[in-house]
Amino acid sequence: RLTDTFRVIGVDLRGHGGSDPPPSRAGLRYEPMAADVLAVLDALGIEEFSAVGESLGGGVSAVVDELRPGAMRRLVCCEGIAFDATAFPRGASPGEGGASGNFMADIARARRAVWPDREAVRARYAGRPPFDVVAPEALAGYLRWGFVDRPDGQVELACDPETEAAIFEVTSEPGGADRAFAHLAAMRGRVAVLRGEASYLPEPWFRAQADAAGTELRTIPGGHFFLQEDTARAEAIVRAELGR
């Protein structure tokens, strides 16, 4: 939908999609992930670009700008994981609590990794949050790229549960979401901050992002994955925010 105007590049961050997980937990911090993005852009000969970053991608995109000042024209940060943990009282920051101290990590570790086939995944996921509200083409894309084929004929999550759990933990530690948040002030005038109206993440988190970046907070109908809930709306958002 956007290729008439943009050269669209999608990067699988470490441990996601076709990218291998790093050998150590430290490799899941934002800086090495951002360095990977720059390595891809260098390999493609791209010197200037705009970014649309959702969730983890929003936070990592801010660090991409930090590592290479002047290369990123604009960032559309959608429910970005970029926050100053000290701004929230204990228990208010998403991720706290649970047996490991991070309930999102606990959920990730309990996630079923291996399924008989993609249709079995579809049957299970389509009626459960958050996939019960995403567009059919978004779910189809996740089934295609979010799972890998196994030699035994089954399919397995491309981002294994332990890697996903470690990412949730690392984002709340130094070098994670705080690193991205600290750079937002340097991006004033070049960032759009968007949140989902029904997001499970707190509105003050994103208002703090917008304040740091010197912009207005824009609230979009939908949840954390509002981009995937309505493809036509997502296209319109990107075109409007990037001015094309």
Protein language model regions, located:
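Helix-rich cap/lid subdomain of alpha/beta-hydrolase
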Residues: 85-158, 172-174
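Structural signature of beta-strand start/N-cap positions in the alpha/beta core
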Residues: 5-7, 47-50, 71-74, 190-192, ...
